[in-house]
């Protein structure tokens, strides 16, 4: 998300947890300001503490507590870089009111109530500025599930041309789930004839006990 920027003005994570991904992106991109939202009150407080422990001035970060999809804390603010590892296939209300929400309304369908993956993706794209880059970790299902998700996927690829790269990751690299995942990279400034880059990194790991690990050499090869 830092490519093309000598220095990011800001970086945003809508499901920031304790803030580790935010801090990493901000560090690599030399971001001036850090923004995030976290639903869990305890984790929200950890994120704020984490910022201060890493030397981020209080005036240079804004972490909000709340449900990102139900109560967006950042209105129509847009950011240079948007990163997130949202909860996989989480449930959300998919209430009728969201059909008139600018984050979701243009896609033609709402993400299903039992799989909010595309709700998070559309939310993130809404907050991405025209020259920015977004990266989101998601389950493989977002690549092929049909119905409403198929409509949204077609909107993002065919109508908007926002999908820049898809990186297939190994299974079992995240604690708590063994499902294969991917990183989706989005840009709003792509040219009409730009191709989508596909990277199969499913074999790029080292097995450590019951967990698969991405080592620096694997990350370097992917990049």
Task: Identify the residue ranges that each predicted region occupies.
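Class I S-adenosyl-L-methionine
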Residues: 1-33, 43-46
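A generic structural signal for alpha->beta connector loops
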Residues: 8, 31, 58-60, 131, ...
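Short, surface-exposed basic-aromatic patches at helix termini and helix-loop junctions that form
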Residues: 26-29, 53-55, 154-160
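Short, solvent-exposed loop/turn segments at the edges of secondary structure
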Residues: 29, 58, 177-179
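General small-molecule cofactor/ligand-binding pocket signal
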Residues: 35, 62-64, 167, 199
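Conserved acidic E/D residue at the C-terminus of a beta-strand in Rossmann-like folds
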Residues: 38
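S-adenosyl-L-methionine
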Residues: 46-76
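A conserved structural/catalytic subdomain of Rossmann-like adenosyl-cofactor enzymes
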Residues: 72, 76-223
């Amino acid at each position: 998300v830092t490519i093309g920027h000598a220095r990011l003005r800001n970086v945003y994570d809508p499901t920031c947890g304790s803030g580790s991904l935010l801090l990493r992106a901000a560090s690599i991109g030399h971001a001036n300001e850090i923004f995030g939202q976290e639903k869990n009150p305890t984790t929200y407080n950890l994120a704020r503490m984490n910022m201060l422990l890493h030397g981020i001035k209080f005036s240079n970060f804004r972490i909000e507590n709340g449900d990102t999809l139900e109560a967006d804390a950042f209105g129509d603010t847009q950011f240079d870089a948007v990163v997130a590892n949202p909860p996989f296939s989480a449930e959300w209300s998919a209430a009728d009111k969201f059909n008139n929400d600018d984050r979701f309304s243009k896609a033609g369908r709402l993400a299903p109530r039992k799989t909010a993956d595309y709700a998070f993706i559309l939310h993130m794209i809404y907050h991405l500025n025209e020259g920015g880059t977004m990266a989101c970790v998601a389950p493989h299902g977002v690549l092929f599930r049909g119905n409403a998700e198929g409509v949204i996927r077609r909107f993002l690829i065919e109508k908007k041309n926002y999908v820049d790269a898809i990186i297939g990751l190994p299974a079992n690299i995240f604690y708590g789930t063994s499902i294969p995942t991917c990183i989706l990279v989005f840009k709003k400034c792509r040219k009409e004839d730009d191709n989508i880059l596909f990277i199969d990194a499913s074999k790029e790991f080292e097995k450590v006990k019951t967990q698969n690990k991405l080592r620096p050499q694997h990350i370097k090869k992917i990049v």
